[in-house]
Amino acid sequence: MDKIKIALQYIMPKHLLSRLVGKLAAAQMGSVTTAAINWFIKQYKIDMSEAAQSEATAYASFNDFFTRALKPGIRPLCEDNDYIVHPVDGAVSQLGPIKEGRIFQAKGHDYSSLALLGDQADDAKRFEGGDFATIYLAPKDYHRIHMPIKGTLSKMTYVPGELFSVNPLTAENVPGLFARNERVVAIFETEIGPMAMVLVGATIVASIETVWAGTVTPPTGKKVFTWDYPTEGPNALTLEKGAEMGRFKLGSTVVMLFAKDALDKFADGVEPKSVTRMGQAFAKIED
């Protein structure tokens, strides 16, 4: 059955399906939308007591529901300056060192940091010998993405690609998954060096937003787009630790890259398959 599920992903019209679902998710259909949201809450056992708006009727569209805000204070931020924090609610897929420019995906599969970053060689060099962490957001999870550490935006890259599912089954079976799917790469300058936040799209998750650019939707095609941003002066964009930096529609994956000697160790309990909660300690900064 698992092989059939993977095979279907290769032949299904993923981009067309994602566009159709995207239009439905953005539609405001009153009682139909409310009924669908209630079904989704029940199906995925979503704890709406954490949401700023706990009633399904508060959301005009599925997208509003998927990107719902949490109640203030529900995710307390680790204020220890020796630690960076979890950027999202989800589960750790993999983490560890970047070895010879390769990132571990699953047993028998890895991929290059160069490919992940859209073949931006200068960017890839900045993370040689560093560390990575991959976090999967399930459909039930809170879908906003936050800053692990204070950083100033220096570059954004949009990389077109496939829209495979990014669930654990697919990660274990599709080679180079995260370097094949459509993605947005945001690079920040931080006190511990450069940090890349890679927001990976997936089936029916073709819409990725950032707080500075809104929905990132370059023209369709195979061209990589890059934007450079000032890191000093009045137009520089600096986001504080814990601040929102982007959001997904439905679930997806975030891959974080850090420079060599930026991190000392991952926090206790942070390992593959461990549950993450935004704001909790994720890794200790190198002294």
Swiss-Prot record:
NCBIfam families: PS_decarb (TIGR00163). Belongs to the phosphatidylserine decarboxylase family. PSD-B subfamily. Prokaryotic type I sub-subfamily. The active site is at D89, H146, S252. The record marks G251, S252 as: Cleavage (non-hydrolytic). Pfam families: PS_Dcarbxylase. It is a peripheral membrane protein. It comes from Shewanella pealeana (strain ATCC 700345 / ANG-SQ1). Binds 1 pyruvoyl group covalently per subunit. This is Phosphatidylserine decarboxylase proenzyme. It comes from the Bacteria. Its EC number is 4.1.1.65. Heterodimer of a large membrane-associated beta subunit and a small pyruvoyl-containing alpha subunit. HAMAP family: PS_decarb_PSD_B_type1 (MF_00662). Keywords: Cell membrane, Decarboxylase, Lipid biosynthesis, Lipid metabolism, Lyase, Membrane, Phospholipid biosynthesis, Phospholipid metabolism, Pyruvate, Zymogen. Is synthesized initially as an inactive proenzyme. Formation of the active enzyme involves a self-maturation process in which the active site pyruvoyl group is generated from an internal serine residue via an autocatalytic post-translational modification. Two non-identical subunits are generated from the proenzyme in this reaction, and the pyruvate is formed at the N-terminus of the alpha chain, which is derived from the carboxyl end of the proenzyme. The lineage of its organism: Bacteria, Pseudomonadati, Pseudomonadota, Gammaproteobacteria, Alteromonadales.
